[in-house]
UniProtKB/Swiss-Prot annotation:
GO molecular function: electron transporter, transferring electrons within cytochrome b6/f complex of photosystem II activity
UniProt family annotation: Belongs to the PetN family.
Protein name: Cytochrome b6-f complex subunit 8
Self-association state and partner proteins as the record states: The 4 large subunits of the cytochrome b6-f complex are cytochrome b6, subunit IV (17 kDa polypeptide, PetD), cytochrome f and the Rieske protein, while the 4 small subunits are PetG, PetL, PetM and PetN. The complex functions as a dimer.
Amino acid sequence: MNIVDIAWAALMVVFTFSLSLVVWGRSGL
């Protein structure tokens, strides 16, 4: 596993996390 794979994995995790936060915020949690 090289640095590019780690960077892509981290980017996907951050993107998914922020997206779910936006969805939660709009749901009025």
